[in-house]
């Protein structure tokens, strides 16, 4: 079974979101998603300063098997991207929840995450997909 962390919120499209102490939201893909993708070879993140919308495409992750869109769980301004992924996209496979995050957003309304799944709901969602 993939690692699923209890402190995160999850989307059915397999992104995770973590609300930081300063109110910003860090976004990445789940351990389950990186396992399904296989070896990640390229990550495209939104540009710092750009606006993203909840439920809309914000980037792309490509592996040896497939390319998948990355969706933002919140609306807001992109304040940081993980530049490490440009040089070492495999970091997503090695550390999807820590070193392999994709981008950070200053949300216009953090309550948009209220509709995201908690870890228990995400586990059930993954099991139902299997």
From Swiss-Prot:
Task: Give the cofactors, semicolon-separated.
Answer: (R)-lipoate
Q: Has keyword Coiled coil?
A: no
What Pfam families does the annotation carry?
GCV_H
What domain of life?
Bacteria
Keyword DNA damage annotated: no
| Entry GO terms, CC | cytosol; glycine cleavage complex
What positions does the domain Lipoyl-binding occupy?
24-106
**N6-lipoyllysine modification, residue list:** 65
Q: Please explain the role this protein plays, according to its UniProt record.
A: The glycine cleavage system catalyzes the degradation of glycine. The H protein shuttles the methylamine group of glycine from the P protein to the T protein.
Matching entries from PANTHER family are given as: GLYCINE CLEAVAGE SYSTEM H PROTEIN, GLYCINE CLEAVAGE SYSTEM H PROTEIN-RELATED
Oligomer status and interactors: The glycine cleavage system is composed of four proteins: P, T, L and H.
Q: Family, per the entry?
A: Belongs to the GcvH family.
**Entry protein name:** Glycine cleavage system H protein
The organism of origin for this protein: Teredinibacter turnerae (strain ATCC 39867 / T7901)
Lineage, highest ranks first: Bacteria, Pseudomonadati, Pseudomonadota, Gammaproteobacteria, Cellvibrionales
Instruction: Name the gene behind this protein.
Output: gcvH
